Amino acid sequence: MALPFSLLMALVVLSCHSSCSLGCDLPHTHSLGNTRVLMLLGQMRRISPFSCLKDRNDFGFPQEVFDGNQFRKPQAISAVHETIQQIFHLFSTDGSSAAWDESLLDKLYTGLYQQLTELEACLSQEVGVEETPLMNEDSLLAVRRYFQRIALYLQEKKYSPCAWEIVRAEIMRCFSSSTNLQQS
């Protein structure tokens, strides 16, 4: 079952505005890349989330990291970069390749890699401008612990289809939040 059109359009609108206010020179295609990653994550759904209600889990999403008011641009970019890097790593595991359509997974890797490359170029521009640390150590740890909890959950659930569906939906929410941070 596909994502409802209204939800998909909301995700597209949110991600289209994501790179407009960053303090560096991201290519105009960056926001399209965000949209593409969200759409790919939506297309990757293989089973109904309703059949997996018993597997739901609170991964402790670090919302405070993604509240844009506390960050300057370099810290926000760094938080988004770390999040995308962790998503890339999560979907690069052995258990992931068995769970998803290989073609969609390859497209997701490509999209995430492109986002990482663009953000790294942006970070290198920002490092020369500011001397403040790129990302608060507590924020970095919060993001990494969040993804560790997700990885542990998958391991405990033996990488079941329902576990991956729960994680896919969580990653869509996480990616959308990190995208929103870019526009703050």
Swiss-Prot record:
It is found in: Secreted. Disulfide bonds join 24-122, 52-162. Residues 1-23 form the signal peptide. GO terms for molecular function: cytokine activity; type I interferon receptor binding. Its main location: secreted. Keywords: Antiviral defense, Cytokine, Disulfide bond, Secreted, Signal. InterPro entries: 4_helix_cytokine-like_core, Interferon_alpha/beta/delta. This is Interferon alpha-2. GO terms for cellular component: extracellular space. The keyword DNA-binding does not apply. Produced by macrophages, IFN-alpha have antiviral activities. It comes from the Eukaryota. The keyword Cell cycle does not apply. PANTHER family: INTERFERON ALPHA-5 (PTHR11691:SF60), TYPE I INTERFERON (PTHR11691). Interacts with IFNAR2. CDD domains: IFab. GO terms for biological process: adaptive immune response; B cell activation involved in immune response; defense response to virus; humoral immune response; natural killer cell activation involved in immune response; response to exogenous dsRNA; T cell activation involved in immune response; type I interferon-mediated signaling pathway. Belongs to the alpha/beta interferon family.
